[in-house]
């Protein structure tokens, strides 16, 4: 199976605007909402969303969350893990936290993020925004509140989100794991 392009740059842009306006509808002026990107794959998506939101709201609190050592599988590898930066320069106490990650697959990264976020306070609510929801691959009962598209895929397939900042183009591909 050759890689199948699921989304091109124009489609991704349209989805990002839709997701941003859904956030605006639900969170008004963002005074009680913080946006947190899950390291590393959620950063570019979150920054793109923030860029759109900043056209109307300039004081949105934005942070980065590393979940490396909160994952339930981090001890199952021989290689040394490298943690990413967690940067939360604000309180999440009694705020609505919108977690952002590129692909929701098994739900394990989100479970780890929920554990990690508790170290920083008790949010009023936690919501999830994903560009891609691989909905039939879930191992945990986790669903996105905001979703770009649903992708039905097999276990031997992988979804890759490409960003122009890292990969030279905005696109999403579906391919077999070995490709």
Feature map (PLM): residue ranges:
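PRPP-dependent phosphoribosyltransferase catalytic core
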Residues: 115-179
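Short secondary-structure boundary/capping segments
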Residues: 54, 88-90, 150-151
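Short glycine-rich phosphate-binding loop at a beta-alpha junction
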Residues: 29-39
């Amino acid at each position: 199976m050759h890689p199948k392009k699921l989304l091109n740059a124009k489609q991704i842009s349209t989805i990002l605007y839709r997701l941003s306006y859904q956030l605006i509808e639900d969170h008004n002026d963002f005074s009680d909402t913080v946006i947190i990107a899950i390291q590393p794959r959620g950063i570019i998506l979150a920054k793109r969303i923030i860029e759109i939101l900043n056209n109307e709201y300039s004081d949105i609190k934005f942070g980065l969350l590393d979940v490396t050592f909160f994952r339930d599988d981090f001890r199952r590898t021989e290689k040394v893990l490298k943690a990413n930066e967690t940067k939360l320069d604000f309180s999440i106490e009694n705020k609505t936290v919108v977690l952002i990650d590129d692909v929701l697959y098994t739900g394990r990264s989100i479970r780890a993020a929920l554990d990690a976020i508790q170290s920083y306070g008790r949010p009023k609510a936690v919501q999830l925004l994903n560009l891609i929801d691989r909905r039939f691959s879930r191992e945990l009962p986790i669903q996105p509140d905001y979703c770009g598209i649903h992708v039905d895929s097999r276990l031997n397939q992988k979804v890759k989100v490409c960003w122009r900042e890292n990969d030279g183009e905005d696109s999403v591909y579906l391919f077999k794991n070995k490709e």
